[in-house]
Regions:
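Structural preference for long, well-ordered alpha-helical segments in enzyme cores
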Residues: 54-58, 113, 160
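Walker B catalytic acidic pair
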Residues: 177-181
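Walker A/P-loop-proximal flanking segment of P-loop NTPase domains
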Residues: 2-80
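Mid-core helix/loop region of P-loop NTP-binding domains shared across ATPases and GTPases
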Residues: 123-175
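Generic, well-ordered alpha-helical scaffold segments in large soluble proteins
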Residues: 32-36, 61, 116-120, 160-167
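P-loop NTPase motor core
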Residues: 9, 14, 60-127
Length: 181
């Protein structure tokens, strides 16, 4: 067998697990975080500490987008917990990174953030086909763009979470990375 590689700077959990890199199992973070039942958890660690990889792991664990991906977790400690096997892939998860926002002026940074939000909304276009949104909401949904007005931007994540909650009938897990940009 090939020797395992120590991967440095990996940020995507699936890539980390499937590429046979050496991975320090941090999946019990999922249990600890879930059982804390906090409304908001702030994870502050120094640079290069693996925060993004941890968020990616959390997203892969909970997101409906990754339902049925037992293969990513079956050799990790979280999989020993019967209760958590049932939770894998059963929640709507919004994973948003502001890592790309490097603009120095407020208007430019704002536009960049609004663009990230527009891209996020584009991923959930299926909501427009559903009957969970009324016509007014669908119209507002389509107005989310890089140059949307301040009120629409300020409420956009809350609004999207609300739509996803209606669609899936479950609370939304919102993961923000590089929020301090």
């Amino acid at each position: 067998a090939m020797p395992r590689i120590v991967g440095i700077g990996h940020q995507d959990f699936e890539q980390m697990i499937t590429s046979d890199n050496f991975y320090i199992d941090k999946t019990m973070f999922i249990k600890e975080w879930w059982e804390n039942n906090d409304t908001v958890t702030l994870i502050t660690r120094p640079r290069r500490f693996g925060k993004t990889l941890n968020l990616s792991m959390t997203e892969h664990f909970f997101s409906v987008k990754h339902s049925g991906r037992d293969d990513l977790f079956q050799n990790l400690s979280i999989w020993q917990e019967e209760k958590y096997r049932e939770l894998q892939g059963t929640y709507p998860v919004i994973f948003l990174s502001f890592a790309g926002v490097k603009e120095t002026s407020f208007p430019d940074a704002r536009k960049s953030i609004c663009q990230i939000i527009e891209n996020l909304y584009n991923k959930y276009d299926f909501l427009l086909e559903s009957d969970h949104l009324n016509e007014r909401e669908k119209k507002a949904y389509k107005n989310v763009s890089a140059d949307m007005d301040h009120n629409l931007a300020a409420n956009s994540l809350n609004t999207l979470s609300d739509y996803l909650m209606r669609y899936y009938g479950k609370k939304v897990i919102l993961l923000l990375d590089e929020y301090d940009t």
